[in-house]
């Protein structure tokens, strides 16, 4: 299981399938991003929304469509928030039903470069960028670097507290030792 660090439901499904078929289960964890002193760290989408509700300025949300509902309780969210999500028809429709439409709904497939993240922050005059700590594979550092370059505050939603598994290096060693690879 090398899924996204926030894909808890997928991980449960994989683990259950392995248990049901008596197949060994191994999880490979993405390395967390580097700590950034100028960022605001929060434990959940709700805490991020509460924090942002006390601020002024536009916000680029890069957390994905499944998290958007947690931001709809914010004052003036339809004018302040710019949501970047996958450009799938069902995703765009679900976002529109939450009130994210027009220029406030950006449909694209990532990960994105620092330059493209910075261009979006400038285009929408965003003072904040909200992201999950997706690690290098999720373009995390490029988002943080772009935010800092644009004088936007990165708001980072921490990973689930209980992550079990092994690093990529540990996984390679394990596979070599146990499967003669």
Segments the model singles out, each with a brief description of its role:
Residues 26-46, 95, 161-181:
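Intrinsically disordered or low-complexity boundary/linker segments at protein termini
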Residues 19-24, 79, 149-153:
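A short helix->loop->beta-strand "cap" motif at the edges of active sites that frequently abuts
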Residues 39-54, 63-67, 112-114:
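Active-site glycine-rich loop that binds ribose-phosphate moieties when present
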Residues 94-104, 108-119, 123-124, 128-150, ...:
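A C-terminal functional module that forms or caps the active site or interfaces directly
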Residues 57, 64-105:
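Anionic-ligand binding region
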Residues 88-91, 153-165:
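Short, flexible loop segments at boundaries between secondary-structure elements
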């Amino acid at each position: 299981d090398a899924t996204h660090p926030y894909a808890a439901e997928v991980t449960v499904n994989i683990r259950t399938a392995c248990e049901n078929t008596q197949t060994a289960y191994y999880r490979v964890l993405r390395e967390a991003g580097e700590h950034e002193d100028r960022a605001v760290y929060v434990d959940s989408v709700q805490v991020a929304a509460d924090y942002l509700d006390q601020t002024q300025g536009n916000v680029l949300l890069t957390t994905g469509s499944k998290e958007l509902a947690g931001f709809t309780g914010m004052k003036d969210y339809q004018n302040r928030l710019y949501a970047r999500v996958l450009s799938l028809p069902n995703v765009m429709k679900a976002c529109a039903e939450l009130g994210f439409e027009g220029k406030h709904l950006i449909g694209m497939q990532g990960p994105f470069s620092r330059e493209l993240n910075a261009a979006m922050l400038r285009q929408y005059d965003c003072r904040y960028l909200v992201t999950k700590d997706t690690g290098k594979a999720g373009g995390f550092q490029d988002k943080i670097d772009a935010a800092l370059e644009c004088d936007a505050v990165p708001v980072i939603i921490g990973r689930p507290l209980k992550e079990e598994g092994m690093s990529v290096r540990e996984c390679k060693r394990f596979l070599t030792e146990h499967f003669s690879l």
